[in-house]
Amino acid sequence: MKKFDKSIAAFEEAQDLMPGGVNSPVRAFKSVGMNPLFMERGKGSKVYDIDGNEYIDYVLSWGPLIHGHANDRVVEALKSVAERGTSFGAPTEIENKLAKLVIERVPSIEIVRMVNSGTEATMSALRLARGYTGRNKILKFIGCYHGHGDSLLIKAGSGVATLGLPDSPGVPEGVAKNTITVAYNDLESVKYAFEQFGDDIACVIVEPVAGNMGVVPPQPGFLEGLREVTEQNGALLIFDEVMTGFRVAYNCGQGYYGVTPDLTCLGKVIGGGLPVGAYGGKAEIMRQVAPSGPIYQAGTLSGNPLAMAAGYETLVQLTPESYVEFERKAEMLEAGLRKAAEKHGIPHHINRAGSMIGIFFTDEPVINYDAAKSSNLEFFAAYYREMVEQGVFLPPSQFEGLFLSTAHSDADIEATIAAAEIAMSKLKA
């Protein structure tokens, strides 16, 4: 049995200092029934907690660390930038370099604005869509999480799903009434919403792959249908690629599925592990953002040199060949997890998109939030705790996916499959 004495003591102290002892709810490990692990360091595919335990990491800071922990090039870039100054409140050339890379690789982006988080990106994109169209309502999908902005924290997934809260208290009714929610992967519901409110729907915002109800890819024709419906009704299509951006493919989710939105939100990978976000799209739309246009958005640390340098060094290391290797590794892990579950008669359903993998403990195919909620949460919690004992660090929620990095080796994946085999053999009915 692993020892967690230092993590337990640190969490006891933290609960007097921060709400619930953490700075983001899912980190409290509530849904898996254990004390959170306090991490001390990471290198490559491994993390080490303050008690000295080593884990193969599939959290990767919730997705940003596509090259694993403490990537040499990212670390050197950060050292170099920090020595010259961390922020100036003035433009820097590194902003241009990262912006060029993003514009080159993301099909929908002709102009991009850097911000400090994915939440900032989605909130700003919604304001832009409303300002550009002159309409008020937005359409989102049940279980899709787009950050904690009031307009979007309605029937969201992620930590909200884990805590069993459909919404958050504190969201005014006046805000909520302008957010239409329909089931993910249900194109007919989208069409019906446009029949009812089409003249006032500014945009549809969607994750190309839903990542906060677990990993739920789009059904064939779903994204194409959204593109068609929005174009027919004069609404904008926004892809929230904070999670999928540069993770599922070299050209992001929109390149992977061949559907180009009007606006795209980015985060996570483009910051290389530092706080970052971005939104961009067609030049005609983006030129409405201040100071080019009247739609205001600003940020003290937006485009700061540290985040830009980390993001640039992260993206330049990604090539089309990187994603071929991601596909191979992810297929290997998916097949191994499936084989272990089948061997022990564990009800399960595995979804995957590129290097994102979700395993649900249910017999039901998971294509939307209702199906995801059919998962056996008690079994997941027990499985999670056993995987920790086996030295594998997974996201502590059934409603989050696993992430792979370029640092994960075949040996890491084989060890993870072996750990899952042991865990499932102990937990089978």
UniProtKB/Swiss-Prot annotation:
Q: Does the keyword Transcription apply?
A: no
Q: Which Gene3D superfamilies match?
A: Aspartate Aminotransferase, domain 1 (3.90.1150.10), Type I PLP-dependent aspartate aminotransferase-like (Major domain) (3.40.640.10)
Q: Which pathway does this chain act in?
A: Porphyrin-containing compound metabolism; protoporphyrin-IX biosynthesis; 5-aminolevulinate from L-glutamyl-tRNA(Glu): step 2/2
- Reactions catalysed according to its record: (S)-4-amino-5-oxopentanoate = 5-aminolevulinate
Enzyme kind, highest EC tier: isomerase
- GO cellular component terms given for this protein: cytoplasm
EC numbers listed for it are 5.4.3.8
Keywords on this record?
Cytoplasm, Isomerase, Porphyrin biosynthesis, Pyridoxal phosphate
Residues where N6-(pyridoxal phosphate)lysine occurs? Answer: K268
The record's section on Pfam families has: Aminotran_3
Q: Name one GO molecular function term.
A: glutamate-1-semialdehyde 2,1-aminomutase activity
Q: Where in the cell is it found?
A: Cytoplasm
The source's superkingdom equals Bacteria
Question: Which GO BP terms, alphabetically?
Answer: protoporphyrinogen IX biosynthetic process
Which cofactors does the annotated protein need, by name?
A: pyridoxal 5'-phosphate
- Quaternary structure (record): Homodimer.
Q: Which family does it belong to?
A: Belongs to the class-III pyridoxal-phosphate-dependent aminotransferase family. HemL subfamily.
Q: Which NCBIfam families match?
A: hemL, PRK00062.1
Enumerate the HAMAP family for this protein: HemL_aminotrans_3
Protein name stated in the entry: Glutamate-1-semialdehyde 2,1-aminomutase 2
Q: Which organism is it from?
A: Bacillus cereus (strain ATCC 14579 / DSM 31 / CCUG 7414 / JCM 2152 / NBRC 15305 / NCIMB 9373 / NCTC 2599 / NRRL B-3711)
